[in-house]
Amino acid sequence: MNDETTPANKNPEKAELRCGWTTGACATAATKAALTALITGEFPDPVGIILPKGEVPYFQLAYEGLGEGYAMAGIVKDAGDDPDVTHGATIISTVYPAPPGTGIIFRAGEGVGTVTREGLAIPTPGEAAINPVPRRMMTEICEAICAEYGLPADLVITISVPGGEEIAQKTWNPRLGIIGGISILGTTGVVHPFSCSAWIHSIHRGIDVARAAGQKHVLGATGSTSEDAAQALYNLPDFAILDMGDFAGGVLKYLREHPIDRLTIAGGFAKLTKLAQGALDLHSSRSQVDKGFLWQIAERAGAPADMKERILLANTAMEVLELTQSIGIDIAGPIALEARQTALKTLRGAPVEVEIIVTDRKGNILARV
């Protein structure tokens, strides 16, 4: 385990800007505690986990339950300074053995949503709305614990969030066809506090550091999946990776006055569709994918007229992408070109070469211009 541990609900670098932890990180920690208790009879408290980027936060347990053939543990989510609707929710994991050879099964308990439509991160309707990275984190930690005790990793993991169905009404889940509760989310495990000025300041500081080091190429990504895809191409030093997230405008406007030779913007299809539309803040609460815009792109790419209604009524941008891919139409390339035009327009002639990389949810590159 990494020797550098970070107490949960603390920002290790900026005490004035408190980071939080995702529902996925909380679910993983609760699952580790529950499985450990199921095997040993004792709950680790606090319980530490390793996040995808190597951080090791520790979480205090808010709930423990041990019964015949099952164990439960709960953690209260602290979103730090982010105005997250799930702040204060209790994330509970119940773990019990599954039949031999089953592997690890995830189920949605009270307050956790169920996927009913295609085009989401969980592609199979009927599955629990527990996204891929939290699933992987829980799977890896359960496999490691079971291996330590010489046991097969055949388990049922049920994640529940009391009050989650009410919380979900304040999210996009009902519109996306996720019913019954919230989603268990997160790609890094860390919730960055939503403070525009502070986040944008950190972007500016990152550009300043890169310039001071003589770095000629920087990367701004909307998330860890697209960042990893771009890094597989370039392997840039850490100081060349800007903490862009949803704030594409924060990167571009600062580079306009403080140019670096080359900028790569990498992001998922939906985020970069919004950039292509002209949005510079890509957060879901402040910009939305315009299905009419996507239809115009698809029509220019050769989509038949009878696809228009299906695109306009699509649930998500990813569903539109899959519809067009199914008939051999590429809209990721045109979206990348339009996103690049938005970036160049924002730079207003600054000497910055711009590259756009569009990825899918698995990190596969769909377009690169």
Curated annotation (Swiss-Prot):
Keyword flag Plastid: no
Pathway per the UniProt entry: Cofactor biosynthesis; adenosylcobalamin biosynthesis; cob(II)yrinate a,c-diamide from sirohydrochlorin (anaerobic route): step 6/10
Family: Belongs to the CbiD family.
Keyword Methyltransferase (UniProt): yes
Species annotation: Brucella melitensis biotype 2 (strain ATCC 23457)
Name used for this protein in its record: Cobalt-precorrin-5B C(1)-methyltransferase
EC number: 2.1.1.195
Record gene name: cbiD
One of the GO biological process terms: methylation
NCBIfam families recorded: cbiD, PRK00075.1-1
Record keywords, A-Z: Cobalamin biosynthesis, Methyltransferase, S-adenosyl-L-methionine, Transferase
Enzymatic reactions: Co-precorrin-5B + S-adenosyl-L-methionine = Co-precorrin-6A + S-adenosyl-L-homocysteine
Any one GO molecular-function label of the UniProt entry: cobalt-precorrin-5B C1-methyltransferase activity
Top EC class of this enzyme: transferase
Superkingdom classification of source: Bacteria
InterPro entries: CbiD, CbiD_sf
